[in-house]
Amino acid sequence: MLSGAYLRVLNERPGQAVLWSLGCQRGSASSTEGNRCVEAAEACTADEQCQQLRSEYVAQCLGRAGWRGPGSCVRSRCRRALRRFFARGPPALTHALLFCGCEGPACAERRRQTFAPACAFSGPQLAPPSCLKPLDRCERSRRCRPRLFAFQASCAPAPGSRDGCPEEGGPRCLRAYAGLVGTVVTPNYLDNVSARVAPWCGCEASGNRREECEAFRKLFTRNPCLDGAIQAFDSSQPSVLQDQWNPYQNAGCCFLWVSSMSILTALALQALL
């Protein structure tokens, strides 16, 4: 069930949507209240397009379709599915999953695991490679290079501007960051005690290109423009998700329209919440 709320079919007709009732008890509070990452996951599950794209990357990154054998995933398939998720999914919902704010380690760990880091991010190696390796691959890639340039143009500090960041760059910065997910420089949250993000790489073994390596990594780890854009989105997230709820609701009950064809997949995805 959706985070402890009871689920009831109010109306169902073949080929039409189903109106589900979520926790319709006057005065009762959802167990997800205050956990924006769970709220974002539930909102995605309730949206047919978001849920379908999410189930696709789950299948490729975590399911049998995306794994060669124990401990070995087909990373190219996983990353392709992630690119499709952000390219075709509703930005309000995909970004809510990516940038949801957390106040505790349990929420932060759920957020860190949302986009299958064992396959899409870090892989089986114990130590991260030099950032120069994925950076060089990205700059040679027709798919990755323009995405990285867009991220640099939209998120890199701009000393000449009013606040030191690109003008009105917050939403563009988040879109550009999301565009990197599924590339060879896929970023993710680094731990469950902070909101630090970076690709899976370091600069310890960078030789005489250490400065170049550090400059690239600091675009993620020490970037006030990226940090500010994420914080601004987190502040607006409740109103963003509110727009996804069906207008047929009252003070004690909220409803979601869910395709009858997506019910089983939606319930299966609850394990990821």
UniProtKB/Swiss-Prot annotation:
InterPro entries: GDNF/GAS1, GDNF_alpha, GDNF_rcpt. Weakly expressed in heart, brain and testis. Residues 251-273 form a propeptide. It holds the Pfam family GDNF. A lipid is attached at N250 (GPI-anchor amidated asparagine). Receptor for persephin (PSPN), a growth factor that exhibits neurotrophic activity on mesencephalic dopaminergic and motor neurons. Acts by binding to its coreceptor, GFRA4, leading to autophosphorylation and activation of the RET receptor. May be important in C-cell development and, in the postnatal development of the adrenal medulla. This is GDNF family receptor alpha-4. It comes from Rattus norvegicus.
